[in-house]
Amino acid sequence: MEEIVVYVHGKGGSAQEAEHYKALFPNCEVIGFDYHAQSPWEATEEFSGFFTAVQKRCGKLTLVANSIGAFLSLSSLNEKLVDIAYFISPVVDMEQLICNMMQWANVSEAELAEKLEISTTFGETLSWKYLCYVREHPISWKIPTRILYGEKDALTSMETIKAFAEKNNAELTVMPGGEHWFHTKEQMQFLDYWIKNRRPCNETENKDGFASPAYSSGNRAGSLPCLQQGPAVRIPPGSKASV
């Protein structure tokens, strides 16, 4: 049975973005997940149902998820449904993000608890139900994971992404000067290199589900090409190395 790659888009994105990843996973079926869930409690049923159906017809299921799509995947999926995950600018601590947005909007927790929902000037609606849900349902993630993170990501701090990577034994690659939204020519080139150089088709997977390079390079193992702004920083699973 073949490998299937499922792409989960971020806010404002679409399943059609999966087309970009077909060239990066040439021997796989790549499909975009056109989900409708707007919250983790809605995603629990929708995501698990979709991935269960896909998993039944493949030998290996690879997840590629972007931004909020990564968070909804984190809150809905498990190692029984997904074999390996690639996260691009993932939201990994929704409680922290909501609290940050409350500060940006000058909204106290007491005010949000009283009003339940508050619209903001930056286009987001703060929700007391959402905040309570993520506090009551902490993320539990055991799937081998690789993360691509932009150094200038305004939604998730370096401290937060490193803490998640260390806690969940995930491999973290940082693009110097990169943003939350990978969209410029340089950023997309970096993203493509990242996937190509971390793919098992170019590498030999080890017992932990991560891949070890099967090629020789002048750079240290698994490092990505230097793209003007400096070399990528790659933190292997379990490493406490600082950026």
Place the predicted regions along the sequence by residue.
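Short, surface-exposed "cap/lid" segments of acyl-processing enzymes
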Residues: E3-N27, G32, H36
